[in-house]
Amino acid sequence: MAQRRAAAESARHQRLLEGKAQAEGGSARTSLLILVSIFTIAAFLMFLVYKNFPQLSEEEGKCIKIPRDMDDAKALGKVLSKYKDTFYVQVLVAYFATYVFLQTFAIPGSIFLSILSGFLYPFPLALFLVCLCSGLGASFCYMLSYLVGRPVVYKYLTEKAVKWSEQVERHREHLINYIIFLRITPFLPNWFINITSPVINVPLKVFFIGTFLGVAPPSFVAIKAGTTLYQLTTAGEAVSWNSLFVLMILAILSILPALFQKKLKQKFE
């Protein structure tokens, strides 16, 4: 009986999203134009942020770019550490804006910025900064998806969105815990969580809080690794077996309240 009910619910979600895909399929081109416009405006704002940066030498200017590997991160860290005391606000604003920009548009590179924060700032500030940037950037991505991304989700991610929608409904009473669990664990890519959450009715407030708290444990690992930035050769070296074990324990703890309440509810019903 339960299996038939679950199958019926899955089919209902499938039909719902497919219907929305057909209804909004024609707006995909409009959504793309809006997305390009928003990206262009954001890129221009980033340009203004870097125009306000201190005067750099030609060699230093080559290092001011989004890091793609550990060598880029080391070169960028060397330049930023030179100027962060004299131009504290400018460096902090540039770091903040870049991190949020990458998260908003799901551009790779934020892991290196997380590591870099541990090199540039005291641990408490670095952790708060990374959690805030991650929470805001993911929330902006959420709002962007709500505004222009739904046709893409309906058309290309229908099946995956349906499966996650079912999981969200099962954990609706403990949605913050579930979001925290997903942020700690690698079961779902962050970009997928960001763009599908508004489509399956995850509230923005819950989404932000769950993200802010959920990224803290993995960020803790990256920031601690940043204190030894110049000893690292790849981002993978930032994660040890001990840190993976700790993350696993924290992930289990984050979902325990939901499991206990579910068991208690079943016991007393």
Swiss-Prot record:
It is a multi-pass membrane protein. The keyword Metal-binding does not apply. The keyword ATP-binding does not apply. It comes from the Eukaryota. GO terms for molecular function: phospholipid scramblase activity. The chain crosses the membrane at residues 30-50, 87-107, 125-147, 175-195, 203-223, 240-260. GO terms for cellular component: endoplasmic reticulum membrane; mitochondria-associated endoplasmic reticulum membrane contact site. It is found in: Endoplasmic reticulum membrane; Endomembrane system. It catalyses: a 1,2-diacyl-sn-glycero-3-phospho-L-serine(in) = a 1,2-diacyl-sn-glycero-3-phospho-L-serine(out); cholesterol(in) = cholesterol(out); a 1,2-diacyl-sn-glycero-3-phosphocholine(in) = a 1,2-diacyl-sn-glycero-3-phosphocholine(out); a 1,2-diacyl-sn-glycero-3-phosphoethanolamine(in) = a 1,2-diacyl-sn-glycero-3-phosphoethanolamine(out). One of its GO terms (biological process) is nervous system development. Phospholipid scramblase involved in lipid homeostasis and membrane dynamics processes. Has phospholipid scramblase activity toward cholesterol and phosphatidylserine, as well as phosphatidylethanolamine and phosphatidylcholine. Required for autophagosome formation: participates in early stages of autophagosome biogenesis at the endoplasmic reticulum (ER) membrane by reequilibrating the leaflets of the ER as lipids are extracted by ATG2 (ATG2A or ATG2B) to mediate autophagosome assembly. The VTT domain was previously called the SNARE-assoc domain. As there is no evidence that this domain associates with SNARE proteins, it was renamed as VMP1, TMEM41, and TVP38 (VTT) domain. This is Transmembrane protein 41B.
